[in-house]
Amino acid sequence: AAGTLGVESTPGVCRVIDGTGLVASPGFIDLHCHLREPGFEYKETIAAGSKAGAKGGFTTLCAMPNTDPPIDNAAVVEFIHQKIRKDSLVRILPIGCVTKERKGHELAEMEELASAGVVAFSDDGDPVYDANLMRLALVYSLDLGLPISNHCQDKSLSCNGVMAEGPVATHLGLDGIPAAAEEAMIARDIALAEATGG
C-alpha cells in the first residue's frame, strides 16, 4: 500500500492496492518447521517445504533435526546445505541436535554443528530428560551464542495423551495431556537457564 506519507502521486502504470486491514511484511520466519530431508522424504522434502513456505509468505524456515540421520554432525549439515542450494525457494536454516541421534544420552558435537552452520539446537519431538546433560548443553550453547529449543514435555505425565486434558478430551473419549506435563519441564529448564545463564 502506498499510503499517504511522502507520496504525492503514483505513476499511471502503477497498480495501487488498498492495504486497509492487511499486514505488509518483507517475509515471515517459521522458527519450527519439519522438512524431514534426509530420510523421510515421503513426509516432506526441502523443495516441497520451501514452496509451501513461499506461498504462505515465509521467506525463512528453521528446519528441525528430526531427520534420518538426525542433524547431529557436520556431514548432515553439509548435505542439507547442498539440498538447500539446489532445491529451496526460500532461506532455510538448519537446527542441530542437542544430543547424538536425538536419544538424550550424550551431547552432540555442538561446536562442530555451530561451525557447520546450524542456528540453534533441539532434540525436537523428544525432551532432553537428563537435567545435567541439559545443564551442560546450556553452558555450551551460551559459549556458542546459539539458543536451545527444548521439547518441553514430561512424557511420564503425558503418557499416551493426544490432546489437552479437560472436558473435551473426556467427552471425545481421548486420553488427555495434563498441563503439568509441560509445566514441569519448563520449570526445570528455567531453573537450569538461571543457574547457567544459558
Model-assigned labels for residue ranges:
Residues 19-87:
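Metal-associated gating/positioning segment near the N- to mid-region
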Residues 105-198:
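Histidine/acidic residue-rich metal-binding segments in metalloenzymes
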Residues 25, 74-95, 139-150:
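Alpha-helix-loop-beta-strand connector modules within alpha/beta enzyme cores
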Residues 31-44, 65-67, 93-106, 172-180:
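Active-site mouth loops of central-metabolism enzymes
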Residues 65-69, 97, 125-126, 153-154:
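Short, ordered loop/turn segments at secondary-structure junctions
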Residues 1-27:
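Histidine-rich, glycine-flanked metal-binding segment
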Residues 20, 41-45, 72-76, 101-105, ...:
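Short secondary-structure boundary/capping elements
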Residues 27-33, 61-63, 92-96, 120-123, ...:
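Hydrophobic faces of well-ordered beta-strands that scaffold small-molecule active sites
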